[in-house]
């Protein structure tokens, strides 16, 4: 049986567990700072270090963030929930248990729409992914392995407890994902959502967003799930996709070879582009959950929920729909513009200043995006203000300048800002749109090129394009290109 034949006979069942580190100023159960760049073991206190006799106190901002994200994913907010102790021993967990939520999470039964883009056609397919639950918990510390970037090969390990007690939201998806592309897109959509809400920076490199993948394969048409394998250690969206694609191939090959799939945790190795076995996967019974005795149950009133709901911004899916339906943008442009909330706000400011939405979309998604990418900048630091972009588009629309001149002055606007009107006046770049003035210039150009005129008369080559180029050269690109083309066609026909 060929590998291709085997692969088409199976489907992958994929779910993601995503840990989102919140950007609160203090930790979830104490007043210690959450500053990422602090020296090791400086943002600690008896509470987050698990000293005897101390009591945790819930940071209300964590609850607010959980409810807001729950509302954003159309989840059911629990009027009553509680915290639980998750028991396990590891050097980065000083209490030997983690305060989390087990059977009564703050949010259940949500969903998130993802968009899958065809790279060739740019067509978009939408799919809704169910979200089983969202719950609050505290982060563990960070192990630093001396002598190696991994445990294997290191001489000893150091523990930084600064991260202990930093608030996390864990979002557990339904097993609705089928490919690595879908999983990576889901993770990106989740990051986009927490950034729009302002509750996390979603930075995977710093560990603000961490994804664990649960994956199994089964024959197409079979209802029962296969044996689930967990994959960890993916620090980018491309790593999520590659790890899943590798694991699908590995499991299908193992089944085809008559091997057993074990329920285990595997690590993604970026260097070798493969997953390796780490440990046998634990079940919930292994953690011996029981209710946290030092924290009272949580109650969220309808009034509290409505207060937090009123603070939600326009979410990405709503923005995309508005851009398509009211502004007439393509689904692809709407997607690109809403990927980053600051880009969307920039676009909207330019449109509100009077510019045509499609023209603004073209400039933002093409020339401006290229400049930002090449210079590793964000749009919030761009010298070209939205109002100036609207002014530039207006100058083109009115025929004051050509699109070519607009692109010629764009680098200065991007780097230094300023008024497009003042720049073209200072440089003498106002477009020549007077028919009489252009006619005189064209007649002079034709008179200066008798050989080319003869070629035109004999029907050789695209000589009209030659004369347009000569007019543009003589006017320094200031001639109205559309009017120039029309007048040249008319004058050449008469010559």
Curated annotation (Swiss-Prot):
SMART domains, per this entry? GatB_Yqey
Q: Which PROSITE patterns match?
A: GATB
Listed under catalytic activity are: L-glutamyl-tRNA(Gln) + L-glutamine + ATP + H2O = L-glutaminyl-tRNA(Gln) + L-glutamate + ADP + phosphate + H(+); L-aspartyl-tRNA(Asn) + L-glutamine + ATP + H2O = L-asparaginyl-tRNA(Asn) + L-glutamate + ADP + phosphate + 2 H(+)
Q: Which InterPro entries match?
A: Asn/Gln-tRNA_amidoTrfase_suB/E (IPR017959), Asn/Gln-tRNA_Trfase_suB/E_cat (IPR006075), Asn/Gln_amidotransferase (IPR018027), Asn/Gln_tRNA_amidoTrase-B-like (IPR003789), GatB (IPR004413), GatB_C_1 (IPR042114), GatB_Yqey_C_2 (IPR023168), Gln-tRNA_amidoTrfase_suB_CS (IPR017958)
* Gene3D superfamilies reported for this sequence: 1.10.10.410, GatB domain, N-terminal subdomain
Give any GO molecular function from the UniProt entry.
Answer: glutaminyl-tRNA synthase (glutamine-hydrolyzing) activity
What is one Gene Ontology biological process annotated in the Swiss-Prot or TrEMBL record? glutaminyl-tRNAGln biosynthesis via transamidation
Residue pairs linked by disulfide bridges in the UniProt entry:
none
| Lineage top rank: taxon | Bacteria
State one Pfam family annotation: GatB_N
Q: What is its EC number?
A: 6.3.5.-
Give the protein's function: Allows the formation of correctly charged Asn-tRNA(Asn) or Gln-tRNA(Gln) through the transamidation of misacylated Asp-tRNA(Asn) or Glu-tRNA(Gln) in organisms which lack either or both of asparaginyl-tRNA or glutaminyl-tRNA synthetases. The reaction takes place in the presence of glutamine and ATP through an activated phospho-Asp-tRNA(Asn) or phospho-Glu-tRNA(Gln).
Whom does it interact with, and what assembly results?
Heterotrimer of A, B and C subunits.
Give the protein's recorded name.
Aspartyl/glutamyl-tRNA(Asn/Gln) amidotransferase subunit B
Q: Which organism is it from?
A: Synechocystis sp. (strain ATCC 27184 / PCC 6803 / Kazusa)
């Amino acid at each position: 049986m060929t590998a291709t034949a085997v692969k088409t006979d199976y489907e992958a069942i994929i779910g993601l567990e995503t840990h989102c580190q919140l950007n609160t100023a203090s930790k979830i159960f104490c007043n210690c700072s959450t500053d990422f760049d602090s020296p090791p073991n400086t943002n600690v206190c008896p509470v987050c270090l698990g000293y005897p006799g101390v009591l945790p106190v819930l940071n209300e901002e964590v609850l607010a963030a959980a409810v807001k994200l729950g509302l954003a994913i159309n989840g059911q907010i629990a009027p009553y929930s509680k915290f639980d102790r998750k028991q396990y021993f590891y050097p980065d967990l000083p209490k030997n248990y983690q305060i989390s939520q087990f059977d009564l999470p703050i949010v259940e039964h949500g969903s998130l729409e993802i968009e899958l883009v065809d790279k060739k056609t740019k067509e978009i397919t939408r799919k809704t992914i169910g979200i089983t639950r969202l719950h609050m918990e505290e982060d563990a510390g960070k192990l630093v392995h001396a002598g190696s970037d991994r445990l294997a090969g290191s001489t000893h390990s150091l523990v930084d407890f600064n991260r202990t007690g930093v608030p996390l939201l864990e979002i557990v998806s339904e097993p609705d994902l089928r490919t690595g592309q879908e999983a990576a897109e889901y993770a990106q959509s989740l990051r986009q959502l927490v950034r729009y809400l302002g509750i996390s920076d979603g930075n995977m490199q710093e560990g603000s967003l961490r994804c664990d993948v649960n994956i199994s394969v089964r024959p197409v048409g079979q209802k029962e799930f296969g044996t689930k394998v967990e994959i960890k250690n993916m620090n980018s969206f491309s790593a999520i996709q590659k790890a899943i694609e590798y694991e699908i191939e590995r499991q299908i090959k193992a089944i085809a070879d008559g091997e057993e799939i074990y329920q285990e945790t595997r690590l993604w190795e970026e260097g070798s582009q493969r997953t390796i076995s780490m440990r046998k996967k634990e079940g919930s019974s292994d953690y011996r959950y029981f209710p946290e005795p030092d924290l009272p149950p949580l109650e969220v009133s309808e009034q509290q929920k409505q207060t937090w709901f009123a603070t939600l911004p326009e979410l990405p899916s709503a923005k995309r729909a508005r851009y398509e339906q009211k502004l007439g943008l393509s689904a692809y442009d709407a997607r690109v513009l809403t990927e980053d909330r600051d880009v969307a706000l920039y676009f909207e400011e330019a449109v509100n200043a009077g510019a045509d939405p499609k023209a603004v979309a073209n400039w933002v998604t093409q020339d401006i995006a290229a400049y930002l990418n090449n210079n590793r900048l964000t749009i919030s630091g761009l010298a070209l203000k939205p109002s100036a972009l609207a002014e530039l588009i207006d100058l083109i629309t009115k025929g004051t300048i050509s699109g070519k001149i607009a692109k010629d002055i764009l680098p200065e606007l991007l780097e230094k800002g300023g008024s497009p009107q003042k720049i073209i006046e200072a440089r003498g770049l106002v477009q020549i749109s007077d028919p009489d003035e252009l006619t005189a210039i064209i007649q002079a150009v034709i008179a200066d090129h008798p050989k080319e005129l003869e070629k035109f008369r004999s029907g050789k080559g695209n000589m009209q394009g030659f004369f347009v180029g000569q007019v543009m050269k003589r006017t320094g690109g200031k001639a109205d290109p559309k009017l120039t083309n029309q007048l040249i066609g008319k004058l050449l026909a008469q010559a």
